Amino acid sequence: MAIFGVKVADRPAVQLNIGQAGTAITSARAAVQAGCAETDARIEAKITPTETDYLRQLGYSVTAIRLCDEAMRLLLRVQGGNGLREGSSFERRYRDFQAMPLHINAHPDRVAELVGKHLLGVENNAPFQ
């Protein structure tokens, strides 16, 4: 596809945004893989997770979601108005993705508060169970 005779892939802003989105997705994947590796190792060693373990796992997932959100926003920027007007499935997927972190287990405000309290040694009124 070309706009004003220049291929979209040849535009520096497209390259920049795609590059940043790719890096964000790679980092999100690394966070998830690190969390899964920790969980697998704990299961293999038959170690019951502590509150610290639980909160670190929540942190991995919230970080991965945040990085994927950043990637989605960058890809939306690349699509621009023409991409949205042409009606690909991206807009629906973007909207659906926005609902994901609103679920209580992945809600960034909830997780950040719990992790912050734990790191500061403040009593948590919703203790790990």
Where do the PLM segments sit?
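A structural signal for alpha-helical segments
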Residues: 6-9, 13-16, 23, 45-59, ...
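Extended amphipathic alpha-helical segments enriched in small hydrophobics
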Residues: 1-42
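Glycine-rich phosphate/cofactor-binding loops in nucleotide/flavin-utilizing enzymes
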Residues: 82-129
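A generic alpha-helix surface/boundary motif
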Residues: 12, 69-70
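C-terminal helix-coil-helix/basic helical segment that borders enzyme active sites and/or dimer interfaces
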Residues: 27-62, 73-84
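Generic structural signal for well-ordered, non-transmembrane alpha-helical segments
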Residues: 19-26, 58, 62-69, 95-98, ...
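Short linear motifs at secondary-structure transitions and domain/linker junctions
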Residues: 2, 51-52, 127
